[in-house]
Structures are given as structure tokens and as C-alpha cells.
Amino acid sequence: VNQLLQTRYPDIYALGDCVEVEGKVLPFVMPIIHAARALGLTLGNKPTQVHYPAMPVLVKTPACPIIVSIPNPNTKGEWQIEENKDSIKALFQDTEKNLLGYALLGLATAERAALTARLPPVMQ
């Protein structure tokens, strides 16, 4: 579908965890929430494109919390990994040191908000 969540057929829209928007499949709750808000406005005669901010995914494991924000697969960059006995922090940065993704485990998950603020949006 396009960013208005329109299929190629007039008046048919798509919403849910299996929707591909402009080539991106984001099968998680937060993208659905953003899409539902945009689609509601569109169906109310106010055409609104869906925009996705950076949306890290929380992997719910009680023994070891994990938060991941994967970089675009076509992006060039390097992972920088720091680890200690209670945590792992992996940052994916481009050649100019712009943060494009991360993985946090254990105590490093406390850095989620600060790191997410530095990420680019998934779709503008």
C-alpha cells in the first residue's frame, strides 16, 4: 500500500501487522497504532499519510530484557559493541557517527529513551 494505506483498488485500504507500506513490513503494535490514526483521518475525508518514528521493539523476556531498533538493511555502517557482566549495548552508526540502530540487553535497556531520540524516523 502507499502512505495513505491505499491499495491499488479505489476505496480499499489496508491496516494490520502484515501490511507492507512503501516496501516496509513492520509487524508490531506501534506501527499499527500510527497507521490506524492516519487511516482514521483519511477515512474521515482528511487524507493523511502514515509516518513512522523510530520504534524500538521490546523483547519481553523476564530473565534478560532486550530492546532492539534495527537499522535499514541497505545502510552502510558498523556495530560498536560494549559488554559487561550485566549488560550489552550495541550501537549501529554510519561513517559520520550518526546512530541508525541499536540493541540493548540487561541494564543497558535504561538507555532506550536517550538512544531512541537520536534515531532517524522509519518513514517520513
Describe the role of every protein-language-model region.
Residues 1-3, 95:
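A Rossmann-like FAD-binding core segment of flavoenzymes
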Residues 3-26:
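Short FAD-binding loop at a beta-strand-to-alpha-helix junction that anchors the flavin cofactor
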Residues 18-111:
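Mid-to-C-terminal Rossmann-like scaffold of FAD/NAD(P)H-dependent oxidoreductases
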Residues 32, 123-124:
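Short, intrinsically disordered/low-complexity patches at protein termini
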Residues 108-122:
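A short, polar/charged loop-to-alpha-helix boundary motif
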